[in-house]
Amino acid sequence: MIKKKNLLIFFAGFIFLISNFTFAQQNFLYKSNNQNTEQNNIANSILNRIGAGLSSGNVSEISGYLNTQTYLSLANGISGYYSSNQAFYVLEDFFNIYKVTSFHFQSVQTNGNLPYATGVYKYYFRGKKDSANVYISLKEVGDTWKITQITIN
């Protein structure tokens, strides 16, 4: 009789522990998903602001998001890693030569650790209309997102 009682107490305690553990996991996953959703929303907002900067050809709207080392690959043949200051002037020269007529993102991916967007940059160059594909990737730096790569080819 005592063995059955001890066994019953053991199983009741075991079930209690498992249910608490499961609740803790669900609570952790809920918090984690909310944080991911918030980070995705922030990344999406930043990509929209970068898109607005590309649409206007205004590098000042983009410069606050340039990482300490940003990879650039541009239609004028420039490619490599640049500091945020260097990237500002390289992009400013590019926008002055390749005058934007329109820009829009075709795809924005903010799920995961490395958000990115692709789009089409339409411009005038030497009196002719042309277009280039755009790829922009971000990475989380501290409590914000920074541009790690801009490709306009």
Predicted ranges, named:
Residues I62, T70, A87:
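Hydrophobic pocket/interface hotspot
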Residues F23-A52, S56, G64:
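Short, low-complexity N-terminal intrinsically disordered segments enriched in polar/charged residues
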Residues F88-R126:
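Surface-exposed, charged secondary-structure patches
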Residues M1-L29:
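Bacterial Sec-dependent N-terminal signal peptides
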Residues L72-G80:
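A short gly/proline-enriched turn/hairpin at secondary-structure junctions
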Residues Q25-N27, K129-N153:
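Short beta-strand edge/turn micro-motifs at domain boundaries
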Residues I50, T68, K99-H104, P115-G119, ...:
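Envelope-exposed proteins and targeting segments
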Residues G51-S55, V59, N67, Y71, ...:
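Sec-exported extracytoplasmic/periplasmic mature domains
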